[in-house]
Amino acid sequence: FKGGAFEVLHDAETNFSIFHAMGGMADGNAVIAKINPHEDISSALETLIHRAGFARANIHGIGSLIGAAFDGAPPMTSPISEVLIPPGAIWNGALHLPMECVDPDNGQYAGLLTKGRAPVCVTFEVMIVAT
């Protein structure tokens, strides 16, 4: 991955200094992006991948969510969390998005994210790499 970076800049919506994706190349093999508050993380990732035209990709990221529902696992109900996309998150024509979350009470949650049930809290930074 060449040409792109995250820079810390003031964000008027959140009133925080947060990462913003900068630079990049139109014909690159990867995308970096900041996903904004209240966007569903799954839907936002699918949109980014479709725009990039990737048939297959690995997905990496960190951020915060306002609650999260998981397929076959207990939900994370806190309106505040810190989140990691662990290894194994992929796009292969469909999104396979494992997620690990921790809430302010140190409650820990993990599983495959349910599409449409995980809005971004403050921000989410992602890197999508074509495979």
PLM region spans:
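Mixed-charge, glycine-accented linear interaction segment located at domain edges/termini
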Residues: F1-H20, I35, V102-T131
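Short amphipathic
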Residues: G28-N36
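Residues at beta-strand starts and edge strands
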Residues: N29, A55, G93-L95, V122
